[in-house]
Amino acid sequence: MTTTIIGFPRIGEHRELKFITEKYFRNEIPQEELLEAAKDLRAKHWNIVKEAGITEIPSNDFSHYDNVLDAAVLFNIIPKAVQDLELTDLEKYFALARGYQGEKGDVRARPMKKWFNTNYHYIVPAIEKDTEIKLAGHKIFDEFQEAKNLGITTRPVLIGPFTLLQLTDFEEGLTATNFADSLVAAYGQVFEKLAELGAEKIQLDEPSLVKDLTAEEKALFLRIYQTLLADKKGLQVLIQTYFGDVRDIYTELTSLPVDAIGLDFVEGKETAALVATGFPADKTLYAGIVNGKNIWRNNYEKSLAVLDAIPAENVVITTSCSLLHVPFTTANEEFEPAILNHFAFAVEKLSELRDLDAIRNGQGEVALTANKELFALERVGRDAALADRLAGLTDTDYTRLPVFAERESIQREKLNLPLLPTTTIGSFPQTKEVRSTRLAFRKGNISEEEYDAFVKTQTDEWIAWQEEVDFDVLVHGEFERNDMVEYFGENLSGYLFSKNGWVQSYGMRGVKPPIIWGDVTRLNPITVKWSSYAQSRTNKPVKGMLTGPVTILNWSFPREDISIKESTLQIALAIKEEVLDLEAAGIKIIQIDEAALREKLPLRRSDWYSEYLDWAIPAFRLVHSTVAPDTQIHTHMCYSEFTDIIPAIDNMDADVISFEASRSNLVILDELKAKNFQTQVGPGVYDIHSPRVPAVDEIAHTIQAILAKVPKEKVWINPDCGLKTRGESETKASLIHLTQAAKAARKEL
């Protein structure tokens, strides 16, 4: 046996890539300095993997922003509006991801979507009628050569052609089949060039194979690979899958003339059963046995049992997916050893792979014994009172009365808001001063009184500014919060927090997911203090801002000893207490964000309700089911594809929902109309994940497009997400344009 990984974290042990890239974005360093720093980081990572004893090391898993974007640029899948910009190649690359607004033009960023069922986001490629697919880039070759110069012959990694086409937007009238042949030809050129450079093997990632496949999609996949594999240019080809099993195409996949196939034995419910039916003797099986998405130690006995049952003769032990989705290393953490021993971040998972390989070769008895002893321990006790509360829940606990239509009338009279009410999603820019002051308080360098005075000043300034700009429903800005999940987790039992557990979410944006260690209950009121203070500074309604139970669960590293359903319901009871406290404090509009609702939705439609929505939607309803009819409940959802779960979202029984719509050209509105969506809606009228400032006319045009699909009585005007990561000047300029556009639209009603 040998060992490998599908991919390694890119941003660095201390987020080096983030900080150097942001310097480049601020024009503080030239392009050459950014590229050199990235080169140094890649070398460091390759050497870490090599020194850990991993026998096959990937390359081209690094990205300056996103690996799907990298593939699009490699094959010249670049919209004409960006191609025509007189910018460097790197500037065009970032323009696709972030938009561009300057002397040389004004283009919007490409849409972002969730990467399958993770909190990573990819930039959606776009193929237009004039797109000429060809080999245009050189990143994959440069990085292979870099590693080779270090004495490391790597296995280059590239998004496979089928998945790349599946993730691409096509101009009207075009389909993937129109471009399959030209894309296959370009991949063939990649094979040829890599072979010339001395590569022995290439990894083509095809995670789209774990989804439901139509007959047409299967035919396209087979057409692509039968052509591509007809001339491999001397390379060995590994088709790598992850995030599930390949039940729809296992027979056809294993019949292809590939050299190796990577299968997920962690999330792939049927992978073991599929392999048990037989695996070709002339192929190598890359067995994804170490969880690439969670941070708990691998149970060696269980993994060895799975490996022992595999009938394949040639097996490589690997991770279930790229290690992009876990933090870098536990070496920088400060947990007690009794806690830390239960965790394995990316670097530690390399050791787990090596241990499993050694044990299989009869050389890892010490490691196996230590692992058995770890799993023999009772890690954490259970909360009996909490278990009783959960057991006592009935249908009425998940039902809010009166029904939506009656509440809508009551709230309209009570709140007395104008048509097209304006609001924001919750957070305002967290400047360097905000972050440094919070850090000083956490370190004990300033007193609680000093910190509170600072937060009050920030809140006062932004409440006053919102009144000045004439927003209808205000927010307090969340200056006291570091992260929308961690802030709540710090006030809940059962949570642990890493010091340096950063994971890439999109571009240079990192998140630090907390760890659910035990049973979850609320320790004390969390948000009432600052929501009440903000409300005392204005006569306009100020939204209470909460993170919903499903999102808290999905943006944490969950337990593996109980179901995620049970953990989510525990969190729901805790957040319910907070909702009722806010209501008692006089907060009349309470937003319960479910930004990550879709994230753990199974990739196969047949599992959507039974495995997820049947408990995730009730968990949200449990949180707000007992508030008064005149308390308005909002929710917010981030970048995801919602069009196919519209009825489930309506069934959340919120009064208002806001969501991303601007980057995706408001396509969700047609589905809302078709499904007779009842909840009031705030489709984001501009994209906050790009630094460009939308013009008033641009926002006005978006508002008119919304009003063409949604009754004016049900429309709210807001950005598409929180503003914490944006600059203050661009934020204020954009929001002023938003309110101006909304007022202009009202006059036309």
From Swiss-Prot:
Broadest EC class assigned to this enzyme: transferase
Residues where L-homocysteine binds: I425, G426, S427, E478, D593
Keyword Transmembrane helix: no
Binding site for 5-methyltetrahydropteroyltri-L-glutamate: R15, E16, L17, K18, K114, W555, E599
GO molecular function: 5-methyltetrahydropteroyltriglutamate-homocysteine S-methyltransferase activity; zinc ion binding
Pfam families in the cross-refs: Meth_synt_1 (PF08267), Meth_synt_2 (PF01717)
Active site: H689
Sequence positions that bind Zn(2+): H636, C638, E660, C721
Enzyme Commission number(s): 2.1.1.14
Cofactor, how bound (note): Binds 1 zinc ion per subunit.
Cofactor needs: Zn(2+)
InterPro entries: Cbl-indep_Met_Synth_N, Cobalamin-indep_Met_synthase, Met_Synth_C/arc, UROD/MetE-like_sf
Listed pathway(s): Amino-acid biosynthesis; L-methionine biosynthesis via de novo pathway; L-methionine from L-homocysteine (MetE route): step 1/1
Catalysed reactions, semicolon-separated: 5-methyltetrahydropteroyltri-L-glutamate + L-homocysteine = tetrahydropteroyltri-L-glutamate + L-methionine
Binding-site residues, L-methionine: I425, G426, S427, E478, D593
Keywords, comma-separated and alphabetical: Amino-acid biosynthesis, Metal-binding, Methionine biosynthesis, Methyltransferase, Repeat, Transferase, Zinc
Single Gene Ontology BP annotation: methionine biosynthetic process
Family membership noted in the UniProt record: Belongs to the vitamin-B12 independent methionine synthase family.
PANTHER family from the UniProt entry: 5-METHYLTETRAHYDROPTEROYLTRIGLUTAMATE--HOMOCYSTEINE METHYLTRANSFERASE
Function: Catalyzes the transfer of a methyl group from 5-methyltetrahydrofolate to homocysteine resulting in methionine formation.
Protein's name according to its UniProt entry: 5-methyltetrahydropteroyltriglutamate--homocysteine methyltransferase
